[in-house]
């Protein structure tokens, strides 16, 4: 199975790429290597690596791909507020562009990494429920993640299955450090 991982040289992507590669998947990476100077150890050395900004993704990049794991984004609230238009372009518009190209070329599965930030500040002590809890994105980052999920869900069908998951702030050891958060 041929898997495209966007953001494969990022904090989560470096670990995920190695796991999938070691399990025998044919992994294609797409990353702009923006945080290249934040390497703790050697990062992936894929023979099938695309160095490109996610905003420039093309139909050629998704051709003959079976599934996509979409990690590429500006990955937190403070970074997303520096230039909100860029956050919108990367986190929302590029996500929808990638998914549209993928669907057009016959990609079967699209895994979207979203964020729990879309819930904002809770006004209740009730346990969080993905479907029932109110969405209250307070930042550009959170709003772009929520908008992307809404549109991706509309694109999903029997031939193009979209799954989104919403991690909270991720931490731990990775070959690519997160230089954008306080430890």
Which residues fall in each region the model found?
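N-terminal Rossmann/SDR dinucleotide-binding element
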Residues: 1-67
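Rossmann-fold NAD(P)-dependent oxidoreductase module
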Residues: 15-19, 101, 151
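Short beta->alpha connector loops of Rossmann-like oxidoreductase domains
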Residues: 36-37, 75-76, 119-120, 172
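NAD(P)H-binding glycine-rich loop region in Rossmannoid oxidoreductase-like domains
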Residues: 54-90, 101
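Catalytic helix-loop patch of NAD(P)-dependent Rossmann-fold dehydrogenases
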Residues: 82-85, 89, 93-97, 118, ...
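A short helix->loop->beta-strand "cap" motif at the edges of active sites that frequently abuts
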Residues: 105-109, 160
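Residue(s) in the substrate-gating loop at a strand-loop-helix junction
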Residues: 115
């Amino acid at each position: 199975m041929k898997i495209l991982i966007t953001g494969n040289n990022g904090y989560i992507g470096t670990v995920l790429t190695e796991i999938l590669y070691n399990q025998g998947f044919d992994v294609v990476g797409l990353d702009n290597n923006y945080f290249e100077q934040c390497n703790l150890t050697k990062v992936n050395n894929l023979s099938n690596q695309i160095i490109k900004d996610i905003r420039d993704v093309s139909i050629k990049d998704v051709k003959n791909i079976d599934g996509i794991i979409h990690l590429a984004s500006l990955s937190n609230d403070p970074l997303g507020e520096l230039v909100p238009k860029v956050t919108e372009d990367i986190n929302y518009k590029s996500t929808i562009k990638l998914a549209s190209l993928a669907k057009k070329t016959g990609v079967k599965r699209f895994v979207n990494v979203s964020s729990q930030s879309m819930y904002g500040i809770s006004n209740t002590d009730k346990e969080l429920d993905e479907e029932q809890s109110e969405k209250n994105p307070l930042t550009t980052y959170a709003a772009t993640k929520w908008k992307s999920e809404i549109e991706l869900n509309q694109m999903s069908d029997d031939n193009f299955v979209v799954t989104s998951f919403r991690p909270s702030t991720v931490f731990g050891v990775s070959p690519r450090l997160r230089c954008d958060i306080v430890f």
